[in-house]
Amino acid sequence: MIKTIAKKLSVFVLALSLLLMSAVQFSADSYLVSKDGFYYLIENSEAVIYGYDYNNRTTDIVVPNTISDYPVTKIAPRAFSNNTKLTSISFTDAMSLKSIGKYAFYACSSIEEIIIPGWLNSIGEFAFQDCTSLKNVSIYSNVSVIPEQAFGNCTSLEKINIPSTVKSIGSYAFYNCSALTELTLSKNITDIANGAFYNCPNLTLYGYYDTVAESYAEQNNIPFVHLDKKVISGDVNLDGKIDINDVTLLQRYIAGASVLTDDAVKSADFNKDRIIDVIDVTAIQTFIAHGQN
């Protein structure tokens, strides 16, 4: 009889444990929720995805916009890490999602494509590291930082676009992306950390003159293709040489008789004082007179 009671008690405890898994209260406004294979933390009226049922046979995951009417705003650190069954993840429906945590998709070795939508503001360090099947990444968001090792060791990565909102690329962000052949970097990037493109032997960077990207490429012996035309100081008409025609055009511009493009204005500021005036005219004339074409 004692064995029978003990057995019934064990069954009761197990049933109670499973029941509690679907809603575990942590505080007055914080509890766990399990639904559709996801584990959520409801906190401050927002849902954070913090885990996934690895035994779930679904390989294509769509992150929802809400859970129990609470907006899904974050994917917690390591939420999907080491999920080798996962082949695709979609954020299209998750319009409340603002951030992806550290290691969130670390070593999800079967994912082939990631599309980061415009409403997402931040990506955590190591977020997609070791996603070795990842081929394409499209970033349409307002992220300002590609953090440390975010796409490190994504050995199949062939294509990624980096939006103009990005100002900083962290250390080893793309290390060992051996399949990556080209990447365009905007003028807005102000910092590229050491090793950002370490061991990317097939990479060519595309960008602009006099930028951080150009300097980084030169310092690290990475091929660099310019997307703009080199502006020569004093070449006001942008014909590739400095002569009397530039002086005449600049005089007309100062007199209000001609209009210059942005590049021409940059070239016209010969003494680099950010003022276009007769001093620049004189300086260009002197330059020409000395025969320094």
List each model region and its residues:
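Cellulosome-associated attachment modules in secreted, modular CAZymes
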Residues: 20-28, 228-293
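Short, structured coil segments at secondary-structure junctions
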Residues: 219-221
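Bacterial N-terminal signal peptides
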Residues: 12-22
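Structural signature of tandem-repeat unit edges
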Residues: 37, 42-46, 56-74, 84-99, ...
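Periodic glycine anchor positions in long extracellular repeat architectures
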Residues: 101, 117, 124-127, 140, ...
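Bacterial N-terminal signal peptides that target proteins for export
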Residues: 2-13
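Consensus positions within tandem repeat domains that build extended binding/scaffold surfaces
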Residues: 77-79, 101-106, 124-129, 147-152, ...
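Cleaved targeting-peptide boundary
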Residues: 29-35
